[in-house]
């Protein structure tokens, strides 16, 4: 598969592979020299391909000893599921490429993968995606809004988790993030999911019992359920 690039002028995906063609963005005022109709906007592209879209991103977390740890996350757009994460102090293109195999074993790979233009995604990473039959979608320079799901996910992790803890090291950060993602996937509700969690929660009526409070993420958050006495 090829690589889609986002045009910095109108936000429309552009491709370097003739097997995937997305022309000028809708609303640009012209159908192009070929006379072909204008394509979907970037927002429409995200909506129309949500079932086959994933995005990746890195963010950093400092430790108590002033080391900087890099967290790599893989997010499936459908139901906002975090499908994989890992932590390292020294990320490389080879390490990042290996994470994609860990995230999508066998035939579970998405059709498109959205990422920014960081140099960490080198030849090794791009070759791995090509072998997995994944088309890269590159965001325009300095345009984090074009990768909204991943950016929002990183913001949630910071605000709801790592900004409230002192990280001791890699193992400690993995344990913290595992706890947070258990909460995020199974308990945290989303307006875009009709106030459901990424892993669907069963609606409990009053007949199910009294409401009980279950601490999660070391007490930073709580899950509320009904439980029979």
Predicted region positions:
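Charged DNA-binding/catalytic regions of mobile-element recombinases
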Residues: 1-229
């Amino acid at each position: 598969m090829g690589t889609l690039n986002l045009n910095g002028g109108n936000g429309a995906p552009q491709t370097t592979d003739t097997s995937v063609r997305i022309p000028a963005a809708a609303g640009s005022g012209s159908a192009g020299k070929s006379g072909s109709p204008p394509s979907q906007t970037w927002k429409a592209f995200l909506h129309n391909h949500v079932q086959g879209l994933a995005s990746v991103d890195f963010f950093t977390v400092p430790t108590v000893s002033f080391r900087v740890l890099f967290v790599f996350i893989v997010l499936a757009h459908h139901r906002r599921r975090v499908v994989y994460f890992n932590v390292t102090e020294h990320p490389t293109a080879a390490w990042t490429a290996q994470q994609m195999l860990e995230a999508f074993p066998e035939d579970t790979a998405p059709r498109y993968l959205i990422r920014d233009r960081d140099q960490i995604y080198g030849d090794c990473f791009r070759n791995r995606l090509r072998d997995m039959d994944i088309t890269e979608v590159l965001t325009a320079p300095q345009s984090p809004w074009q990768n909204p799901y991943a950016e929002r996910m990183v913001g949630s992790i910071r605000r709801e988790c790592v900004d409230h803890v002192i990280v001791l090291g890699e193992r400690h950060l993995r344990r913290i993030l595992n706890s947070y993602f258990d909460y995020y996937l199974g308990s945290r509700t989303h307006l875009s999911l009709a106030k459901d969690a990424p892993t669907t929660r069963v609606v409990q009526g009053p007949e199910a019992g009294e409401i009980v409070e279950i601490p999660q993420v070391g007490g930073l958050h709580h899950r509320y359920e009904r439980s029979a006495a």
